[in-house]
From Swiss-Prot:
Assigned protein family: Belongs to the CC2D1 family.
The protein's name in its UniProt record: Coiled-coil and C2 domain-containing protein 1-like
Organism: Caenorhabditis elegans
Pfam families noted in UniProt: C2 (PF00168), CC2D1A-B_DM14 (PF21528)
Coiled-coil segments: none
Bias (Low complexity) ranges: 37-59, 108-118, 244-256
Pro residues: compositionally biased ranges: 119-129, 204-222, 324-341
One Gene Ontology MF term: DNA-binding transcription factor activity, RNA polymerase II-specific
InterPro entries: C2_dom, C2_domain_sf, C2_Freud, CC2D1A/B, CC2D1A/B_DM14
Disulfide bonds: none
One BP term from GO: regulation of transcription by RNA polymerase II
Basic and acidic residues bias (residue ranges): 285-296, 363-373
Domain C2: 605-741
Amino acid sequence: MNFNDIDNQMYGNLEEDAELLAELAAIQEEEMGRVSRPAAPARGAPPAARGRPAPAAPANVPGLDPRLLAAALADNHGDGGDEELEMDEDLLNELNGLVGGGGGGGAAPTVPTRAAPRAPGPSGPPPSASAPNSQLGHLKQLHVYYMKAHKSAEQAGEGPKARRYKRAVDKLVELIRAVERGKTIDESEIPVAPPNFSSAAAEPLPPPAPTAQPAHHPPAPPIRQAAHAAESSPPPIPQRKSSAPAPTAAAPPATKEPTDPKKAAIYRILHHRRDLHKQNARAAIADKDKESAKESVEMAKAFDQAIAALNECSADEMDMNDVPPSPPPYRKPAPPQPQAPPTSAGPLGFIEELQQRQQRFQKMAEKAKTEGNERKMKMNMRLAGQFDEAIKEAKRGKLVNVGELPSLPDMGPLPPQTAPGQAAPKLHQRPPPQEVGPLAPSGVEGKSRNQGQLEFLLERQAQFKQAAIHAKSRGDVEAAKKYLVEMKGFDKMIQAAQAGLPVSIKATPIPPQAQTASTTLQPRIQSAAASSSTGVENRGEKLSLLEKTLIEQVRSAETNQMRFTRLGDVGKVRLFEGWGKVAKQDLLLVREVAKRGLQVPKFHYEMRQIPSADLFPDLADDVIELTIVSCRDVPLPSGYETHHANLFIKYTFPAVVNDLPQTGKTKLIAGTASPDFGESIMLNIGSGKSRNSKLQRTFKRGGLKFEVFQKGGFMRSDKLLGTCEWKLEKLEHSAEMEESLPLKDGRKAVGGLLSAKVRIRQPIGDAKAQHIAQKWLILDN
């Protein structure tokens, strides 16, 4: 049974049915009347010219009118969304190379035109068997391309393009169905492939068979072929404007999605955010916003480089917290507001403001003197004298601690202090303290976060290289190998940072140059010896005090440097590196002065806002680390000697989780009344929004309880030697506590001390106080 003849058996031969073809011609004429009404015929014209043509033989039926096809293909909707933008040529070239669109700055690209329909003729030589398959593949590729273009145009809000792409999609669906049924289609019906469309995967279309012009009228062609038959004078088909001119730069090569699940997730995130920047670039070009378009193009290029470098580094070295977030949809920037005309009187400088405030207090003192109020006069004169010292310090170029200067309620803030000879900057609102944490800004002015990370990694690598060379020169081959391995470990991170991919410095090793030896941080200057060697009174005490202060500053800088390294904050790591380096140089200078008997160097203190790193990122958020350090001089039972001691400690943590206290005990240490335990215990404190308030209430009611026991022997129970309780209220504002607690029997002290330490990830109370005002010693020479 021939399945191809089922339609003919059920409905007859539709392509040669005269009545059906006549009805089709009538419908066609009605549609043509809606699209463009022709001029009315002359009054004297015969009725046949005004009326509808009567049904005739199939040979006289014209089929689908080419004028209807021309009207359907015309894009005269009155929309101006596809007009050429007079944009910067460099910007368009960059966008072309990235998204595959936009024209170059040279000659205008050729506008593709649709080939004129050809009249069907007698069939030529049969095409090859691969021709339908290649044609079908080409149509499917075009269909996929126009579907994507239609979605992109709808998302970008481009109505004319979306409607044009929709018509192309519908036409391609119709052509694909026709080819799948084995029917022949005219190539002029295929929508024009855009210039940036790549069909390398498909086989080239075979050239159409040449058709000979018949000398006589052939029988009526089938319906689909009749749709393209040319009339005596068909109207010209309008040229379709290309949706995207030929690109001038090649698009970046596509990167395959990694097989690693972690990398695949990062790949999808980067790809999605890059596409959002591309959409913003297109919208900015359509709005003629050059700056926004250029910025979006640069961001999209950065994401392309990051995607390309994704296969060169491991997923553990990537910190997605550093990836720029998804951009908001593009909006046209508001026009700049007209600025107020500058006033003739500019803001006063720092020294002038100090002088005005001094005069203010002097006038108040004179007024009190005339009133006979001697106490008020002396007070105001003393306050005015403080401004005398501040003005002298400012004129010498030294920093002035404005926090110690008196002020009145109606006085505004002082302008920032500048060096002599420089113009005082305008008053501005003080910015809020920077956030401490992995998402904090880099803190390096004029540089992006990625540039700061790259410079930091290069410096760290150079430091390890110097350390390896120095160790080799000393003959320490093992240390040199270790430093060399650490130096090589920075290569992948540097490559990722150079490609624009964010990296995490949390796990980077600390170079030996950033760690000062413990022997260097031991006090060496003796006050009596330093004074007796020169005969200057109090010289030794001054040098000893300077040394101790500088040692504390070096320790503070190095501790904060390591903490902020674990937090991934490059800016604050560099800040404390600089402070620590200067403090170590000053420390060596003070020791050299004491050694040679030179004059005590001049120095001063300044108030610095120290970024607080009062948190421990190595701890989980739901635990407290308890460290029982040691006991000192524990009172033993009567009749016991020191060698009889066999001590351990029991601890009880208040009920926080499941309303049950957490208890435990340390190991036994025998033979001493001052045992060193050094045991760390992790106590669970739970999590949740109400956790902190519950902990605060618990720590106010009670704290940690310790009980020191002497281990019992045969037929003897353990004997309690002393107890102590530790209030943990300070954890509300501090992340670490360390204290030595006296042992008691009830309320009576029995002698002996117990040392313990507690750490928590971050304070359970006000954790936003991230800057601490601290006096910082600075040597003047």
